[in-house]
């Protein structure tokens, strides 16, 4: 039971880092969105998220523990 709450805490930590990383990458996402068609919002968002993860080595290493 304790390990489950620890896992839940770690997942919320990962999601928080993920969100912060995405917010930091928002200008890049907006730039990508201009390059891509307006209807292709999903691709631009995913590209921004991936770029956010790759540009943040600490987050990338932290998430690498779960992969």
From Swiss-Prot:
The source's domain of life comes to: Archaea
Mind naming one GO cellular-component term on file for this protein?
plasma membrane
Q: Which UniProt keywords apply?
A: Cell membrane, Membrane, Transmembrane, Transmembrane helix
Q: Indicate the transmembrane segments per the record.
A: 10-32, 44-66
User: Topologically, how does it sit relative to the membrane?
Assistant: Multi-pass membrane protein
Per the record, the major location class is: membrane
Where in or outside the cell is it found? Cell membrane
Q: Protein name, please? A: Uncharacterized protein AF_1582
